[in-house]
């Protein structure tokens, strides 16, 4: 028989750097999870993503055991990394802060494909390009997307 789910907690934590302080501690403490056990498992699983923001979905069961799934870093974080930015534009329609090429968009889309709600690489690229546009990042070069 399957375990009964008590709660699902979603967090964004830097890879390899989970510790019991906020936001991890309070969120998991309220769910009754052994915080140190989660931190050890998360840090071991995300050593290769050290320093990058990693969304994680933690499923807590009635017996206080847990499972978690680490997802790919958010598209906005990957775009800022590619464009060497600290933050996006406050006024993306008026003030453009950087530019990236379609090759960068394609690389990010391929990386995020498992987490995106897209069936084709083109639709994933369109989503990533939209995220870039909303951050004040222009996409340069000829668009490989169908018109």
UniProtKB/Swiss-Prot annotation:
Question: A Gene Ontology CC term for this entry?
Answer: cytosolic large ribosomal subunit
HAMAP family (alphabetical): Ribosomal_uL11 (MF_00736)
Under the heading SUPFAM superfamilies, the entry gives: Ribosomal L11/L12e N-terminal domain (SSF54747), Ribosomal protein L11, C-terminal domain (SSF46906)
| Entry protein name | Large ribosomal subunit protein uL11
Give the matching CDD domains: Ribosomal_L11
Give the UniProt family note: Belongs to the universal ribosomal protein uL11 family.
Keyword RNA-binding in record: yes
Gene Ontology biological-process entries: translation
GO molecular function (one): large ribosomal subunit rRNA binding
The signal peptide annotation in the UniProt record is none
| Annotated InterPro entries | Ribosomal_uL11, Ribosomal_uL11_bac-typ, Ribosomal_uL11_C, Ribosomal_uL11_C_sf, Ribosomal_uL11_N, Ribosomal_uL11_N_sf
């Amino acid at each position: 028989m399957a375990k009964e789910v008590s709660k699902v907690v979603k967090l964004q934590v830097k890879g390899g750097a989970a510790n019991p302080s906020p936001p991890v501690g309070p969120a998991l403490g309220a769910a009754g999870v052994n915080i140190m056990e989660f931190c050890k498992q998360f840090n071991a699983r995300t050593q290769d993503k050290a320093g990058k923001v990693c969304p994680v979905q933690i499923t807590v069961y009635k017996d206080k055991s847990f499972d978690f799934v680490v997802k790919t870093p958010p598209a906005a974080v990957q775009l800022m990394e590619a464009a060497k930015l600290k933050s996006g534009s406050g006024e993306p329609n008026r003030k453009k802060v950087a530019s990236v090429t379609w090759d960068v968009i394609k690389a990010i889309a391929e990386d995020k494909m498992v987490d995106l709600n897209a069936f084709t690489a083109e639709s994933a690229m369109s989503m990533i390009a939209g995220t870039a546009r909303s951050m004040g990042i222009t996409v340069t070069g000829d668009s490989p997307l169908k018109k």
